[in-house]
Each structure stands twice: as structure tokens, then as C-alpha cells.
Amino acid sequence: MCGWGREFETLNLNDYRINFYGQTLDGDRFDDVVAKMRQADIVVMGSPVYWHNICASVRTLMERFYGTIPEGEFKGKRLFFIYQGAAPTKMMIDDGEYSMSRFAKMYGFSYEGMATSRAEAKKLREKMTIK
């Protein structure tokens, strides 16, 4: 449990084998990650800015949703996005925001926003305690 009253579980996607879209290799754990997301009221996704965009592990998870998870499946769940890099440009931030907000819309999440700095993360944290 975190210091402000919410229990949470952290999943590091690098610890889960998630096959690329279209692959059917043994050991895929996509369903395990999705099951954890279904159990949560709030999903906080985080990614470093990597090669000007969302990192491969998060991007692969998002891509695997397509055609597998019904649109609107996560209706009622809240999604927050933490996106951090050494010196992201406005274009990089805008692209990450677009990708995550579009993902949220397709799958029914209430997209609560993105944080790219400590100050923005604090504002998102406050939003988590409001509802």
C-alpha cells in the first residue's frame, strides 16, 4: 500500500514476455497483464521517451490489444500516463499523448492525463484521490 491510502501492484512489462502483434509463440504473458489491468480500478502506465516515442514494451502491449480486446472493454477504469525523458521535444510529448489518449478512447478507459515532470505527476496524483 502506498503512503496515501491506495493499494497497488507494479508490473514491469520487461518481466513479462509479450509477443509482437501476430506472433503465436509459446510463453506469451499478454493475457496475464490484461487480467491484472482488468482487476484494477486505476491503471497507471509509464514509459521512458525512447527513440522519440513510447518504449517498445508499452507499445507492444498497446498493439496487442488491437483485434484481441473488444473496444470499450475497460469502461469505468481510469488511465493515467507517466512519460519521462531527458529532454523530450513538444512533438515527442504530443505524440505520446495522442497515442495514449487514442488507446484509452478505443478501450473505454477514462483518460485522466499525462505527466512529463514531477509537478505534473503531483497533479495527477491529486486527481487519483478525487474520485
In which residue ranges do the predicted regions lie?
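Short, glycine-/small-residue-rich phosphate/pyrophosphate-handling segment
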Residues: 75-114
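Mid-chain, well-packed structural core segment of small domains
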Residues: 69-74
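N-terminal beta1-alpha1-beta2 submodule of the flavodoxin-like/Rossmannoid cofactor-binding fold
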Residues: 1-68, 105-106, 111-131
